[in-house]
C-alpha cells in the first residue's frame, strides 16, 4: 500500500487522535485517498472527502484490531468479508461520467455487542442524526418513518439472544463532481416473520405513513404480484434487507433485496426484464451473459437454460450459489428498476481474474473512463500474488442497465482482519510523525 501525496498533506495537519482512530485512518484513509486519486477526483473534492472520512466515519469504526479475529463480526461485505465494519464500492464511469466512490459501514459504539444494544442500533442512529445536522442534503424523514416498522417486537430473553446482530448499516456516496455526500441507510429485519410480511404489511404501511394515505403503490404492488404469480418471479425469496435514501421525501428510493437459487441465465434475464415488461436489447443481454459466465467460471458453451455447475469447497462440501437482486421502488414510477449482483466471493475465478474480466468488458464495449484505474486500487489494497491465489477482496459486482449500457459497480473489502499481520508490519514501518 503506497501513500498518495494528498493523503500525506491532509494527515500532516490533523489534530492528535487516539490509537484506534489513528489505526483506522492509516488503513482506510489511505484506501479512500487511493480510490479518489485513481478515479480522477478534483483535488479539492479529495480533501473534502478525506476530511469527512476522518471526522465522520473513522470515529464509528470502533477499537482497532488486536489480532486477526474481530471482537465484533460486522455483516458489512457479506460472506466475503472478514468482520471489518467498513467496505467500499467503485461504480465504473461511462463515457461522460467519472467513477463514483462509496463506503458502507456498520457504526460501532460503546454499547455495541452488549445486552444494552443487541441490534447495534444506537451508534448508527446517532451517526445518522449527526449527518442530518452537518450535511445539508441529508433528510431523515423517510428513515425515521420506516425504521419503527422494521424494529422487532421481542420480549423473551431467549429470542433477544438468538436474534441479536446488525440491524442497520450506512452508506456514503462521494461523487467526484458534487459538493454533497449522499447517505443511504439499510435496514435488516431480525425476525423471520417480518420478512414474510414485508410486501403485504410492513412496506405498504410504512410508505403510507411516509408519503400519505393516497401514495401510489403501483411499483410495490407490481413486485408483490411478480413474486407471487410470475413463473420466474415466484422463484425469488425476500431477504428482508431494505435500503432507503436519506434525502428529500420526493426523491427517496426504497430498495427491496431478494435472492434466487436458479442460476440459469434465462432466469437471470427474466428477472432483469421483469418477465419482459422492461425490455433489454439482445446485445446487452448478450454482454450480461458473457460477463455472468466469465465471473462465475462457467463454460461459454453452457446453454442459457442450464444451471451453473455446482461448486465444491476445499473440504468437499457443496457451495450453494445464490443470486441477489434488488427492486428499486419509487411512488412516481409504475415499474421498479432492477439490479443484479454477481457474487464472486464463492466463484472458482480468482479475484484478479474477475477484476480483469470486468475491465476487459468495459474496454471492449467502450464503457468507462480508464477502467484500469480500478485495477490499480485493488493492487494497492492487496498484493497481486494474493489477488491471484486467494479470495476475500472482492465481494460482488452489481449490474444494472442504464442508458443502453451495463452500469457496473464493484464491492470490495479492505481485509483489515484477514491481512492483520501484513498491516502491522506496514504500519510499524511508517514514520509516526506523519500521523500523530
UniProtKB/Swiss-Prot annotation:
Any one Gene Ontology MF annotation carried by this entry is: prenyltransferase activity
Key word Cell wall biogenesis/degradation present: no
Q: What class of enzyme is it?
A: transferase
- CDD domains xrefs: PT-DMATS_CymD
The UniProt entry's GO biological process terms, in alphabetical order, are: alkaloid metabolic process
Q: What is its EC number?
A: 2.5.1.-
Task: State the pathway, as annotated in the record.
Answer: Secondary metabolite biosynthesis
This protein's source sits in the domain of life called: Eukaryota
Give the record's keywords alphabetically: Transferase
Instruction: Name the InterPro entries for this protein.
Output: Aro_prenylTrfase, Aro_prenylTrfase_DMATS
Record keywords: Zinc-finger included?
no
List, alphabetically, the Pfam families matched: Trp_DMAT
| PANTHER family (UniProt xref) | INDOLE PRENYLTRANSFERASE TDIB-RELATED, PRENYLTRANSFERASE ASQH1-RELATED
Tell me the protein family, please. Answer: Belongs to the tryptophan dimethylallyltransferase family.
- Function noted in UniProt: Prenyltransferase; part of the gene cluster that mediates the biosynthesis of neosartoricin B, a prenylated anthracenone that probably exhibits T-cell antiproliferative activity, suggestive of a physiological role as an immunosuppressive agent. The non-reducing polyketide synthase nscA probably synthesizes and cyclizes the decaketide backbone. The hydrolase nscB then mediates the product release through hydrolysis followed by spontaneous decarboxylation. The prenyltransferase nscD catalyzes the addition of the dimethylallyl group to the aromatic C5.
Q: What is this protein called?
A: Prenyltransferase nscD
What gene does this protein come from? nscD
Amino acid at each position: 500500500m503506497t501513500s498518495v501525496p494528498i493523503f500525506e498533506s491532509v494527515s500532516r495537519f490533523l489534530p492528535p487522535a487516539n490509537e484506534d482512530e489513528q489505526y483506522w485512518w492509516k488503513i482506510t484513509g489511505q484506501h479512500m485517498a487511493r480510490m479518489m486519486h485513481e478515479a480522477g477526483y478534483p483535488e479539492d473534492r479529495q480533501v473534502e472527502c478525506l476530511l469527512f472520512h476522518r471526522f465522520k466515519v473513522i470515529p464509528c469504526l470502533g477499537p482497532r484490531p488486536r489480532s486477526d479475529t474481530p471482537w465484533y463480526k460486522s455483516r458489512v461485505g457479506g460472506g466475503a468479508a472478514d468482520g471489518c465494519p467498513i467496505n467500499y464500492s467503485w461504480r465504473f464511469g461511462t463515457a461522460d461520467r467519472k467513477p463514483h466512490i462509496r463506503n458502507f459501514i456498520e457504526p460501532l459504539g460503546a454499547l455495541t455487542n452488549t445486552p444494552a444494544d443487541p441490534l447495534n442500533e444506537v451508534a448508527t442512529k446517532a451517526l445518522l442524526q449527526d449527518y442530518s445536522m452537518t450535511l445539508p442534503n441529508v433528510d431523515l424523514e423517510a428513515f425515521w418513518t420506516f425504521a419503527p416498522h422494521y424494529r422487532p417486537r421481542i420480549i423473551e430473553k431467549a429470542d433477544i439472544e438468538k436474534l441479536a446482530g446488525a440491524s442497520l448499516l450506512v452508506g456514503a456516496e462521494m461523487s467526484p463532481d458534487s459538493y454533497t455526500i449522499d447517505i443511504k441507510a439499510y435496514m435488516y429485519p431480525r425476525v423471520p416473520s417480518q420478512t414474510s410480511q414485508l410486501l403485504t404489511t410492513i412496506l405498504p404501511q410504512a410508505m403510507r405513513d411516509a408519503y400519505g394515505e393516497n401514495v401510489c403503490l403501483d411499483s410495490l404492488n407490481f413486485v408483490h404480484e411478480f413474486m407471487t404469480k410470475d413463473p420466474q418471479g415466484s422463484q425469488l425469496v425476500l431477504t428482508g434487507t431494505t435500503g432507503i435514501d436519506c434525502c428529500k421525501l420526493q426523491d427517496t428510493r426504497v430498495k427491496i433485496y431478494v435472492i434466487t437459487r436458479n442460476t440459469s441465465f434465462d432466469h437471470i434475464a427474466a428477472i432483469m426484464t421483469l418477465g419482459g415488461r422492461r425490455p433489454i436489447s439482445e446485445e446487452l443481454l448478450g454482454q450480461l451473459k458473457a460477463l455472468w459466465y466469465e465471473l462465475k467460471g462457467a463454460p461459454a458453451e453452457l446453454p442459457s437454460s442450464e444451471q451453473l455447475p455446482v461448486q465444491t469447497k476445499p473440504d468437499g462440501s457443496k457451495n450453494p450459489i445464490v443470486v441477489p437482486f434488488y427492486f428499486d421502488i419509487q411512488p412516481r414510477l409504475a415499474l421498479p428498476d432492477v439490479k443484479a449482483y454477481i457474487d464472486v466471493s464463492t466463484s472458482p475465478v480468482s479475484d484478479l481474474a474477475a477484476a480483469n474480466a470486468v475491465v476487459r468488458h468495459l474496454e471492449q464495449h467502450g464503457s468507462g473512463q480508464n477502467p484500469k484505474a480500478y485495477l490499480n486500487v485493488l493492487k494497492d489494497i492487496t498484493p497481486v500474488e494474493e489477488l491471484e491465489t486467494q479470495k476475500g477482496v472482492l465481494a460482488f459486482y452489481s449490474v444494472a442497465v442504464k442508458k443502453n449500457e451495463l452500469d457496473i459497480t464493484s464491492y470490495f473489502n479492505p481485509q483489515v482482519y484477514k491481512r492483520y499481520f501484513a498491516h502491522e508490519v506496514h504500519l510499524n514501518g511508517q514514520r509516526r510523525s506523519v500521523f500523530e
